[in-house]
Amino acid sequence: MSKVILLCLIFALFACSISALSKNKNCLKLGQKCNFEKKRCCTGLNCYISQNKCLPVKL
């Protein structure tokens, strides 16, 4: 029974990692123009309208 649960957990983690990678696949990379684009900037980046670029998030 514990092997089945362990296999289910491994499968769930694998599925989550695949979905996370596919979300970031169709996004704008660092330095790409982002104004009036249908795509969004990748995770960790924001579109700065004044510079029209995807740049790292400033905290």
Curated annotation (Swiss-Prot):
Gene source species: Doratifera vulnerans
Location in or out of the cell: Secreted
Transmembrane spans: none
Keyword Secreted: yes
Family recorded in the similarity comment: Belongs to the limacoditoxin-3 family.
Keywords annotated in UniProt: Secreted, Signal, Toxin
Entry protein name: U-limacoditoxin(3)-Dv33
Molecular function GO terms recorded: toxin activity
